A protein has these predicted regions:
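Glycine-centered hinge/linker elements that transmit conformational signals in sensory
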Residues: 47-48, 52-55, 60, 65-97
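Periplasmic-binding protein-like
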Residues: 33, 164-188
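Extracytoplasmic/periplasmic substrate-binding proteins
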Residues: 79-156
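Periplasmic solute-binding protein
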Residues: 1-26, 36-67, 142-150, 224-234
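Short amphipathic alpha-helical coupling segments at ligand-binding clamshell hinges
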Residues: 79-80, 155-167, 246
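Long, aromatic- and glycine/proline-rich binding clefts that accommodate carbohydrate-like moieties
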Residues: 177-235
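Short, charged, surface-exposed loops that flank catalytic or proteolytic processing sites
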Residues: 18-24, 235-250
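Conserved N-terminal structural module of periplasmic/extracytoplasmic solute-binding proteins
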Residues: 244-245, 253-263
Length: 263
């Protein structure tokens, strides 16, 4: 990789002490006013569709690829289903609505700190990055902008390596736009510049690096499992399948897929 972005969520730590699906669900349903898991984004008539983000995270969190097993029949995944159902009601609300999590994309040094005004939302006095609700340390998602590899049978390995080396040089990394450089010394220099201009604080830089340190990457190709989850979410959100039925169906289909591919 030569660059990356991070999709995450910011939350006021005073409003939520834990970021597991069960904790988020409890906070939403016990609120005196309608409280949705996420701030609804303006993205067409249907609002922002959180199903793909939920499917991507769950394909990572509820699969043990070493054992070729999964836990979609767990209370945690069922809480994920309930959160997504709650969020569906937010689509009918005017923008913005009352939500716990604020979606954020970190694409360069200038967006390392969360700024609610970028999304036309009221500011938070304080925030932490928590990612999508997860039983693990962080539910944020790492997106590589480009991935390069050298073919083992290539007869031009030296030239290919020279090109890859150039992509990691300071001048090339400094010129990247809408992505964070993988060359950490370049990123440090960019953040130091932001700090000098007082557009960011050291605390906000520390929060960013805590986020980076907590990122998890899926250890298998998750697309087939994500597809299964999305297919079973459709009847659930349409009211044609119960929470237990959906969880059992996803568990059965994903387990069969894992046994066929990885056992």
């Amino acid at each position: 990789p030569v660059g990356y972005r991070i999709s995450t969520y910011a939350v006021d730590p005073k409003r939520l002490a834990a970021f597991t699906p069960e904790a988020v669900l409890k906070a939403c349903v016990s609120s005196d006013v309608p409280l949705y898991p996420f701030i609804a984004n303006s993205a067409g008539e249907d609002g922002f569709d959180y199903a793909p983000a939920m499917a991507a995270l769950c394909a990572r969190d509820y699969v043990d690829i070493e054992k070729a097993s999964c836990s979609f029949d767990s209370d945690s995944f069922k809480a994920q289903l309930q959160l997504l159902e709650l969020q569906e009601a937010a689509k009918a609300e005017s923008f913005p609505c009352n939500g716990l999590f604020y979606y954020d994309v970190i694409a360069d040094a200038g967006t390392v700190a969360y700024r609610a005004e970028r999304y036309l939302l009221p500011p938070m006095e304080q925030y932490v990055f928590c990612g999508y609700p997860s039983d693990h340390a962080n539910g944020s998602v790492l997106h590589f902008s480009e991935l390069f590899a050298i073919n083992a049978n290539s007869k031009q390995k030296s030239g290919a390596w020279a090109f890859l080396s150039y992509l990691l040089t300071q001048p090339c990394q400094e010129s990247m736009q809408l992505r964070l450089p993988v060359n950490d010394s370049v990123l440090h220099a960019q953040l130091a510049g932001q700090l000098k201009k007082e557009t960011i604080t050291q605390h906000e830089i520390d929060l960013f690096y805590q986020l980076v340190d907590g990122l998890r990457v899926a250890d298998y190709p998750t697309d087939p499992v994500e597809q299964i989850i999305r297919e079973e979410l459709a009847p659930y959100l349409a009211g044609d399948a119960t929470e237990d039925e959906t969880a059992d169906k996803v568990q059965s289909r994903v387990y069969l897929y894992l046994q066929e591919q990885y056992q």
